[in-house]
């Protein structure tokens, strides 16, 4: 016999007498739809509500109600009872179906549900016998399957729509000697099965077969009211020695609960038993929790006549017409009861069996773990805490086991956290620290490599790398970094911890170009310092599509400018890299930036890192300054004082400057208006490094001729200065003649004897008539070292030339005065004297002139018919007159074009002559009214 623990998981809700409105002795009970239905021996049926108060009642049968069942799908009540006999040969036992939703009046003060079907149970084909059991199965509405068990071992079955009398009746034979004490329907897939219990056997009918097939499951049966069905459709039979469960294939488990079973039932997974205890002579009502092997409730009761369940309660109806309602306590109350007794395993089983939510289960396990932890049973406590993962804050558990120095248990917990994917970075750090502290390399290997080939690692990668690296487990850290694609970490360990530069270069070469570029930007400084040639080879492959390992070529290659900062302490390597790149790639989008950087490298005297050009390219100025300072601080001081080194540096500087000049020329071909470098930057670099050749080339290309001669002036290179002016001062070749004036001014202010140079300059000034003699005199007079003999011949020639011009102008003036005088005389004559027209022929047609004729003051005469409509002007003189007027209008129009005027003044050798011409033609001689 099982010795089960007893608990009070249920409690009495209320009890009392059944209302007096329920008349007669109670024969049968049923429940459903919030009501308890009672059938009495006087044929009445009564309904009780939730408060066990009388709700309604009606007379179902004239004599007695033996069985009844309240259906679930439809609000029907099926009863079996005795009615009046129609004849002595015909039994009065009837089956009735009542529709409880349809009420009809019975007299003036009562009403009853409508009886929609009446069936005589016993007929000639179905002989009368005592009814011992009754069960109704609701199939697809309106079909009912009713089984009626008899004391002769027969089962009468009725199937169909009783209300419409569309039914089929058949009988099943179990045993001719034993009564049918219990029935139970079960659906097994699509097959309908019927359990039938007698005192001597347990049987099963397959209702799908025709006729139904009988199978005997056991040769020991049960008595009336000791048969029930579980919620899993298992048949339960109670016998004095035990309770047996049956499946479709035979007897299942049994429970040795001794005592004669009076009533059996099933409620929410609990087995309900009313047992006569022979030892004490009491009748006991027990509620069994079979899954958790405990008695959930036990109470001594008086004689029970019926047992049913409704409203979430268990209802016991006693023989004295009193009842007892028993209800289940809430989960919290039950758990508190178990916690007080330290029955944590029972509590866990309880919440799991009743399908409580996972959080509630985890809470119970936490309390159990706390209990075990308090008893210092750390291993078992940790097992419970592991089951709370996902619901209990991990820090609660971790803190406990950190304090207790239980590193093995803590390691186990952290491993489970990672398995479930709930570990944070801190958890990963702690677990790896546990492994390293325990020096458990095997577990560390398992943790690191268990995901090998499966997919993403289920822990924080960077945290794992940091911890392994700090504990000198470099191989593990590198494995994680490589598996997770953390190339920067992999290289960091190789370079900073292991100093394995060859493997680092090999690893970078194996990466995709985009990834390799990123890693080179981060760790290129170290690689350049130790493996410059190999690193430059990798950079060349990245930037020029040469030999990419996996054969994948990028549509957008990285620019060499992106990698310049990795050479911050190695300008020689940078120069070598950019030269190699420029040889291969001629049309790079970053060609200007590359040339700028190369120019700074070529032109700097000490070959420093190109900070100016990089700032122009938009790189971080603070980073550049810091890197340059670091590079300077690392410079070898002996190299600055060693004479041989100085000679070598001077030679190197000369060679680089020559390269710089070649680059200046090559990157500014004649067909380009702007060069492939920053001109302003190039000028600054040449100025800073005193690179005269480059500066002269740039100024000349930019047509800054005055700056060109300024360079010669600064160096007092008189020969080169004059040669430069000869080349750049010829206006016929696009030069600037004013350079000679600047040159003359220079010699006038130099304070040295430069007679030879001045004479040569005066030759070109005189040839191109660049300056007036007075300006030449004033300019050269400032040099005290020059004598008048320098300009004697020049002045004589200019005076002679000016004298000739003055004489020519005097004669022209006299001529114009004579012409003007004659014109004024003619005008006066026209005003004061008459004109005699003596022409005898028409000027137009040359025929004899006759009247009407037209005479003009110009002494031309015409037939009037030859003039036509034009009688106001002479056809012979009009073209010349119009030409003069058109010229006048053009001059007036030109007077408004100021740009043209200044352009002519600027382009002329003698600007004053242009102004005089404008005045002479009367273009700008008229003063306009400012208000007009």
Swiss-Prot record:
One of its GO terms (cellular component) is protein-containing complex. InterPro entries: ARM-type_fold (IPR016024), Clathrin_H-chain/VPS_repeat (IPR000547), TPR-like_helical_dom_sf (IPR011990), VPS11 (IPR016528), VPS11_C (IPR024763), WD40/YVTN_repeat-like_dom_sf (IPR015943), WD40_repeat_dom_sf (IPR036322), Znf_RING (IPR001841). Keywords: Coiled coil, Membrane, Metal-binding, Repeat, Vacuole, Zinc, Zinc-finger. SUPFAM superfamilies: ARM repeat, RING/U-box, WD40 repeat-like. Residues 795-841 form a coiled coil. It holds the Pfam family zf-C3H2C3. A zinc finger (RING-type) spans 842-877. GO terms for molecular function: zinc ion binding. This is Vacuolar protein-sorting-associated protein 11 homolog. Expressed in roots, leaves, stems, siliques and flowers. Signal peptide: none annotated. Core component of at least two putative endosomal tethering complexes, the homotypic fusion and vacuole protein sorting (HOPS) complex and the class C core vacuole/endosome tethering (CORVET) complex. Their common core is composed of the class C Vps proteins VPS11, VCL1, VPS18 and VPS33, which in HOPS further associates with VPS39 and VPS41 and in CORVET with VPS3. Interacts directly with VPS39 and VPS3. One of its GO terms (biological process) is vacuole organization. CHCR repeats lie at residues 385-536, 548-756. The gene is VPS11. Belongs to the VPS11 family. It is found in: Vacuole membrane; Prevacuolar compartment membrane. Involved in regulating membrane fusion at the tonoplast and the prevacuolar compartment. The keyword Membrane applies. The lineage of its organism: Eukaryota, Viridiplantae, Streptophyta, Embryophyta, Tracheophyta. It is a peripheral membrane protein.
